[in-house]
Amino acid sequence: MQRQLGHKRYQPIWEMMHKLRSVMGERDSKYNLEGTIELDEGYFTRNNDSAKDEDEDENQKRGLGSQRKSKVLVMVESEKADNPKPSQKSRKCGHLKMKVITDLKGETLKSAVECSVSPDTTAVMDNFASHSTVEKAVSKSERQTVRGCNAPKVLPWVHIAISNAKSLFTDMYHGIKEEFLQEYLNEFCYKFNRKYFGDRMFDRLVIAAVSYKPTFEHKLYNGRANCG
């Protein structure tokens, strides 16, 4: 973006992009997911802030419990496909939401779901213990035992979304700090939800940018929220 705009300094462009990502999140927060949704958690490796953090990692957990992984609740509208071909998914997807969460406690997940889906939603999810609390936020739930072999059939679009987001962040940004992860997820979901817009996506973003105030603030320019 800096090269395309011909701007000499990186910092203003970096902040502008984060404010646009913030606006994307504000726009998508105005609607709730409906119908049947797939729900699961994703774990995103975050970038270390310093060499000191890398040294501390030697004494930290590995895998899903690692302190270097940010927890993300992923929800996507999903309906059973009518007579899918062998090469097609068993479910077809709608809109997507991804929310960074502080922990995997039932109340934390329930609160995030209540802010993201309609009360009459049906949630398809695995048998993770905290999901029993999530059931209180929806009208109906379908909990199944999900293992590696059947995950693509039970929760196909959740896992596709997580995999694609991880690949994008790794290839394009080479690591993201936790404090900025939600902004990048906002952009990923905004584009995913408008994948059929084509050239109209830019026009819709311009409308959103003048309709919503970005919530992103940073130390640049004294933390002012307005684009400069």
Stretches found by the model and what they are:
Residues 1-228:
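Residue-level recognition of single "structural anchor" positions
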